[in-house]
């Protein structure tokens, strides 16, 4: 199994995260990385877990040994600046592999881009603001839903679709760590494409 995990996330858990995050209501307001560290320590006491409640690029600069010791870096935060920093480092050549994963709105589709050890760069697959150029679904307003009277917004997604995507990402990561994938790969999870239209979107395939 995985003997060591380093969790990096600057965000705190908010109510909009519930249902699509492994953390629950008891963790609301807590730093995600530190709360998840505690949960993993309780559930898997044999796994060593380190947490940084900051951005990955900060850890790369202040604690470079974290990345130097890593076998695989998995980024699922959908923070484009952090993703750019990781791909910039990857393009120069690294010993660690990079797995970038995310869900499209409503979690009917998820993607994972894998770059093994070496020099690779997937930034050309995205627009300047981080939108994937080969998305499978299209939504009004880019899938962003505004919350009334508070100036906030969110991208909707259900727990069932997220479970499928999380499983796909986990399986891909384990296959990399076990040596079963050693070339650049793009893996996608498609749940119920017929539901995309029902939810107000368009399935592009």
Predicted segments, located by residue:
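A structured beta-alpha segment of the ubiquitous adenosine-cofactor-binding alpha/beta core
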Residues: 37-71, 78-79
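N-terminal Rossmann-like FAD-binding beta1-loop-alpha1 element of flavoenzymes
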Residues: 1
């Amino acid at each position: 199994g995985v003997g060591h995990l380093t969790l990096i996330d600057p965000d705190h858990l908010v109510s909009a995260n519930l249902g699509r995050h492994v953390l629950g209501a008891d963790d609301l307001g807590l730093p995600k990385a530190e709360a998840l560290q505690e949960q993993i320590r309780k559930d898997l006491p044999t796994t060593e877990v380190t947490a940084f409640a900051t951005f990955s690029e900060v850890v790369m600069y202040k604690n470079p040994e974290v990345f130097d010791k890593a076998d695989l870096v998995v980024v699922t935060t959908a923070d484009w600046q952090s993703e750019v920093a990781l791909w910039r480092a990857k393009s120069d050549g690294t010993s660690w592999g990079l797995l970038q994963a995310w869900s499209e709105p409503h979690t009917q589709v998820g993607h994972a881009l894998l770059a093994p050890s070496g020099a690779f760069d997937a930034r050309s697959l995205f627009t300047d603001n981080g939108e994937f150029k080969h998305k499978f679904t299209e939504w009004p307003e880019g899938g962003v839903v505004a919350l009334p009277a508070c100036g906030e917004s969110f991208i909707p997604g259900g727990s069932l679709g997220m479970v499928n995507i999380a499983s796909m990402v986990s399986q891909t990561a384990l296959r990399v760590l076990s040596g079963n994938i050693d070339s650049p790969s793009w893996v996608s999870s498609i749940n119920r494409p017929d539901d995309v239209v029902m939810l107000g979107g368009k399935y592009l395939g």
